[in-house]
Regions:
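Alpha-helical interface subdomain recognition
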Residues: 1-101
């Protein structure tokens, strides 16, 4: 379980780095699109954050729900990322639209 969690977090990081690299290329004047990569990074990172923190809370048992433990706060923070950066459905629409262009 821990290995799967670490692998998903690392994959999410790589998607974020790729989107940032594309955005940087765009900022340097290259004619590249970065909206699909950004949407993929937002979608995957938000979903992985929620999945991994939920598993972390479960691994901690009852202590995972106590406010004194960081894992409880991390799960709350992960939940808001699913909403704040645009819902998963919106990100999927952005990705699909970019693929169809």
């Amino acid at each position: 379980m821990l290995a799967d969690m670490a692998t998903k977090v690392e994959a999410a990081k790589l998607l974020v780095y790729k989107a940032a690299m594309k955005k940087n290329e765009y900022a340097q004047g290259k004619k590249v699109s970065y909206s699909m990569e950004a949407a993929m990074a937002k979608l995957y990172a938000a979903e992985v954050a929620m999945e991994v923190t939920t598993k972390a809370v479960q691994l901690h048992g009852g202590y995972g729900y106590i406010r004194e433990y960081d894992v409880e706060r991390m799960m709350r923070d992960a939940k808001i990322t699913e909403i704040y950066e645009g819902t998963s459905e919106v990100q999927r629409m952005v990705i699909s639209g970019a693929m169809l262009r």
